[in-house]
Regions:
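N-terminal targeting leaders characterized by basic, low-complexity, disordered sequences
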Residues: 1-95
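Structural motif at membrane-water interfaces of alpha-helical integral membrane proteins
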Residues: 5-20, 80-204, 210-302, 588, ...
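Signature of the cytosolic headpiece of P-type E1-E2 ATPases
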Residues: 137, 201, 216, 435-536
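Hydrophobic alpha-helical transmembrane segments
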Residues: 172-181, 230-258, 268-381, 529, ...
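Asp-based phosphoryl-transfer active-site loop
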Residues: 375-399
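Basic, amphipathic juxtamembrane/active-site segments
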Residues: 394-417, 508-509, 514
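ATP-binding catalytic core of ATPases
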Residues: 403-454
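Conserved ATP-binding TGD loop and adjacent catalytic N/P-domain core of P-type ATPases
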Residues: 458-460, 495-630
Length: 653
C-alpha cells in the first residue's frame, strides 16, 4: 500500500466531552483540577533561626550549629570541604543488608526461522521415543500389578524370577530411550544447577543397581524393584521434553511465516497512567531470546532440587544404615529419588503450552516464551483499531455516484487522499479503488478531524469527506431520495462531488472474541478513526456488547492509535493475521497458560516433598510390602492428575 508522510497538521474540533473525560482520567489535586505540583518555596528563616547557634550540647531534633563540622575521630572539617562518610569497619553488625543475586543474562537472540529449523530437527524421532517408552512403562506397570498381590488370581501367573528378569530388561530399554533426559540431568549436575532431570538420573541409577543386586545377590525379600515408577518418571520427563520442543517449534514456525508481523506488548501510561495491550507492526527482535528463557515453574523446582538431593541421601542413610538395615540402602535410594523426581516436573508449563499452542498456531498466534507470558500479567485493557473490528475485506463498496462536473477519477483521488491522511480503517478499501480507477493520491496540506467527518486542504481547495450527518452540519444539501446509512460523501469547495455507498460486514468471530475478553477481565478500548464507527452506529448494528466497550473521545483515540508509541520491554505474542480474534486469543491464552503453570508448579513441588517424607517413613520401617512398585506408581500417577486436569482446563473457554 503506498504511504506518504501525511499532512503537516492534524487538528481537532473542540469536543465538550473531552475536558470532562480528561478530568476523570487525571487525579485531582487539593487546589483544583488545573493546579500543578509546585516545588517547596524557600523563604526567609523563621524568627529564632537566624544568628549564631547556642553554645553547648544540643538535643536531638534541634538545628545543626553553623561553622566547621566535626568529622568522626574528633577532626574538624573546613566548611568548603565535603565530609567523608564513615567507612564500615570489621566490628559487629547484627543487621547486614543482603546483596541481591545478580540476574543471569538472557539467552542469545536468533531469527524465528532458524529456531524453527533447530527445534524441528529430530522432533518426530523424539515423539517415537516417547511412544515406545510409554509402551514399555505400561508393560512394567502390569508386571508391578502382578507382583503386588492385589489380585490373588494373578499371583502364580508368572514365576518371580521371570518377572524380575523381564522387568529389568524392559527397564533397561526404557533407560536407553530416555538417554536425552539422563544426559541433560548429568549436564545440569556438572554445572552445579541440578534440576528434575538430575533427580531422574539418580532414580534410574539406583533402580538399576537395586535390580542388578537383586538378580545376583538377593539382599532382601523377593520383590520387584521400582522399575515401573522409575520408568514412568523417565517417560513423562521425556514427554515433557517433547512438549517443550513441539510448542517452541510451532511458535517459531508461525512467527517466521510473515516478514513483518504484528507484535503484542503491554505498553505503559496509556489510559490515565495505566497499562494496556496494544498490537503494532514491527520486527520481532528478542523473540528468540524469550523462547529460550527458562520458565518460572522450572526455576522454582530447580531451587528446590538441591534440598531434595540432600534430603534423599541423608534420609536414606538414616532410615537404613542407622536402623541396622544396610541391605535396603539401594532400595531406599531408588524409592526416595523416584518420589522426588515426580511425573509433572517438565509438564507444568510445557503441557498446557503445547495443548493451547496448537490451537493458537491455527489462528496465526505465536506466544513469545515465558517472558511473554509474564509480560501479560496485570493487563486489564486492550486497544482495538479499525482493522480489529472490521479487517480488510469486511468493508466493501456497494455503489458509487458522481455529482457535478468532476470525473470519477478526480473524485476518488480527493476522497482517498483525505482518508489516507486521517489514518482511517477505510484506507485499504479506497486504495483498491484508486488502483481500479487508475487514479493517484494528492498531497494533503492540512486536515481537521471531527467525529463524523474530515476537513482537508489540498492544492488550495477545501475537501470535505464524511457521512450524511457531517454534510448536513456543514450546510451541504444532499440530493433528495438518498438514504444511505453507511455512505461516504465528498465535497470540494462546499460543492458535493461524489458518494460512495459502503457495506460493513461484521465477521462472526468478532462478537465472541469481545465477549471472551470481557469474561477474562480485559476491557476492550475502541481507538478507531473511521467516522462511521461511532457508538451510535455500533449500537444500531446491535451485535456488539456496547455497554462493556470503552469509547474515548476523538483526540484520545487518534493519540492512542498513532505511530511511535512507547512499548513494553517484552513481546507477549506475535500475530500473523488481521482481526480481533488472534489478538484476543493471544491475550486470553497467555493468561490461562500462566495461571495453569503456577497451579501445576505448586502441586509438583508439594508432591515431591510429600513423596520424600512418605517414602522415608516407610523405608525406616522396612515396609517392603506397603511400599512396592505398584503402590509407588499409583502414588505418582495420582499426583499427576491435578497437572493433567489443569492443563486440560486451559483449552476450555
Amino acid at each position: 500500500m503506498p504511504q506518504d508522510d501525511g499532512p503537516e497538521l492534524i487538528a481537532f474540533t473542540p469536543d465538550p466531552k473531552a475536558a470532562a473525560q480528561q478530568a476523570q482520567d487525571q487525579p485531582a489535586t487539593p487546589e483544583g483540577d488545573g493546579a500543578a505540583e509546585q516545588p517547596p518555596m524557600q523563604g526567609p528563616p523563621a524568627p529564632g533561626q537566624t544568628g549564631q547557634a547556642a553554645q553547648g550540647p544540643q538535643a536531638p531534633g534541634q538545628g545543626t550549629p553553623t561553622g566547621p563540622k566535626a568529622a568522626p575521630g574528633g577532626q574538624t572539617v573546613p566548611p568548603g570541604k565535603p565530609q567523608t562518610p564513615p567507612q564500615e569497619g570489621t566490628g559487629f553488625h547484627p543487621f547486614r543488608e543482603r546483596k541481591a543475586r545478580a540476574e543471569a543474562p538472557p539467552p542469545p537472540d536468533a531469527p524465528p526461522a532458524q529456531l524453527a529449523e533447530e527445534y524441528g530437527l529430530g522432533l518426530q524421532a523424539l515423539k517415537g521415543k516417547c511412544t515406545a517408552a510409554g509402551v514399555l512403562s505400561a508393560v512394567l506397570l502390569l508386571f508391578a500389578l502382578l507382583d503386588s498381590g492385589v489380585l490373588p488370581v494373578l499371583d502364580s501367573l508368572l514365576p518371580a524370577n521371570i518377572l524380575l528378569l523381564g522387568s529389568l530388561a524392559l527397564f533397561a530399554g526404557c533407560v536407553l530411550l530416555s538417554l536425552d533426559v539422563l544426559k541433560e540431568g548429568l549436564v545440569q549436575l556438572t554445572n552445579l544447577a541440578p534440576n528434575g532431570d538430575t533427580l531422574a538420573l539418580f532414580a534410574a541409577l539406583f533402580t538399576l543397581v537395586d535390580g542388578v543386586t537383586m538378580v545376583f545377590t538377593p539382599l532382601r525379600e523377593s520383590a520387584i524393584p521400582f522399575f515401573s515408577p522409575c520408568a514412568l518418571v523417565l517417560t513423562f520427563h521425556l514427554l515433557g521434553r517433547y512438549c517443550d520442543r513441539s510448542a517452541k517449534f510451532q511458535a517459531c514456525r508461525v512467527a517466521a511465516s510473515v516478514s513483518q508481523p504484528y507484535l503484542v506488548t503491554q505498553d505503559p501510561n496509556v489510559l490515565g497512567g495505566r497499562t494496556a495491550f496494544r498490537k503494532w507492526l514491527g520486527v520481532p527482535k528478542g523473540f528468540g531470546s524469550q523462547i529460550r528463557t527458562t520458565s518460572q515453574a522450572e526455576a522454582r523446582f530447580r531451587r528446590l532440587t538441591p534440598v531434595l538431593l540432600v534430603a534423599c541421601f541423608c534420609l536414606s542413610l538414616v532410615t537404613t544404615v542407622a536402623h541396622h538395615q544396610p541391605n535396603l540402602v539401594f532400595w531406599s535410594l531408588s524409592a526416595l529419588f523416584t518420589a522426588a523426581a515426580t511425573l509433572g516436573v517438565s509438564l507444568a508449563l510445557n503441557l498446557p503450552l503445547r495443548m493451547l499452542g496448537g490451537k493458537l498456531a491455527k489462528l496465526g498466534v505465536a506466544l513469545a516464551g515465558w517472558p511473554g507470558l509474564l509480560a501479560g500479567k496485570g493487563g486489564k485493557a486492550a486497544l482495538l483499531l479499525d482493522q480489529d473490528i472490521y479487517p480488510p475485506g469486511t468493508v466493501a463498496l456497494a455503489g458509487s455516484r458522481v455529482f457535478g462536473s468532476l470525473s470519477m477519477e478526480r473524485t476518488v483521488a480527493f476522497t482517498a487522499s483525505v482518508i489516507r491522511a486521517s489514518g482511517s480503517g477505510l484506507t485499504y478499501l479506497f486504495d483498491k479503488l484508486v488502483r481500479a480507477e487508475g487514479s493517484g493520491y494528492l498531497p494533503i496540506e492540512k486536515i481537521v478531524m471531527q467525529e463524523t467527518g474530515l476537513l482537508g486542504q489540498c492544492q488550495g481547495q477545501q475537501i470535505l469527506v464524511g457521512n450524511s450527518d457531517f454534510m448536513s452540519r456543514q450546510g451541504i444539501a444532499l440530493p433528495p431520495g438518498i438514504r444511505a446509512k453507511d455512505a461516504v460523501f465528498c465535497a470540494v469547495d462546499r460543492e458535493l462531488v461524489g458518494m460512495f455507498v459502503l457495506k460493513y460486514t461484521l465477521h462472526p468471530a468478532i462478537t465472541p472474541a469481545l465477549q471472551s475478553m470481557v469474561l477474562h477481565r480485559i476491557a476492550p478500548v475502541m481507538v478507531t478513526r473511521d467516522f462511521n464507527l461511532n457508538p451510535h452506529r455500533l449500537r444500531l448494528w446491535g451485535r456488539l456488547p456496547m455497554d462493556q466497550l470503552t469509547f474515548p473521545d476523538l483526540q484520545r483515540r487518534v493519540t492512542l492509535s498513532g505511530p511511535n508509541q512507547p512499548h513494553g520491554p517484552a513481546i507477549l505474542a506475535v500475530l500473523c493475521r488481521e482481526g480481533i480474534a488472534p489478538f484476543s486469543q493471544a491475550l486470553i491464552g497467555a493468561k490461562r497458560i500462566r495461571r495453569a503453570a503456577a497451579f501445576s508448579s505448586f502441586f509438583v513441588n508439594f508432591s515431591a516433598c510429600v513423596g520424600v517424607v512418605l517414602t522415608a517413613s516407610l523405608s525406616s520401617a522396612g515396609a517392603l510390602g506397603a511400599m512396592c512398585a505398584w503402590h509407588l506408581s499409583l502414588f505418582l500417577l495420582l499426583w499427576l492428575v491435578p497437572v493433567l486436569l489443569i492443563s486440560l482446563w486451559t483449552t476450555q473457554y
